Amino acid sequence: ASRTVPRLEMDMNRMFPGDASGDMMERITAAVVDSIIGSDICMDLHASDIFVREIPQVRLSEDFAEALLPYAKMTNADMIWMNATATVHESTLAHSLNLLGVPTLVLEMGQGHDIHRSFGNQIVDGIFHIMSEMDIWEGPESVLQEPAVSSDGEVEFIRSAVDGVFLPLIEHNHYVKKGDL
């Protein structure tokens, strides 16, 4: 799946909140927003791109972090990244819905537009927990993990400096400090 509009090569997640009187794409994004208004919560799920492998994480804009952090901690994600990247900034679905009063979390995970089943199951456990807290779900719940919470400057992507095959010296989802490798 892709959020890029075929043939137009336009990123739909940079067109929100849309305009009901605008062009075709503005009308579509406005209709999406309109269909979600009034919801108790929204979770915007993203699989990472083909060059990045990411642990399950919630990305929050600093503008809404105080209100969203309690929900984010219930998602069962490995990490909460505050003020992280463009996925939570203006013209995105999450930013627009948060401005309009719908608490919206961006969950990012996986690699190559693929969400591994274990990551999906982990987040589904969190979704059931949130539903239970909101009195929507009465079934059994899994024990949730405590996520690491980070603000800008505390998260680094590890990437190869040159073209070729990149073989990391550490496993995914480990803390690394200067001098460790």
Explain the meaning of each model-derived region.
Residues 1-181:
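Structured catalytic-domain cores with a bias toward divalent-metal coordination
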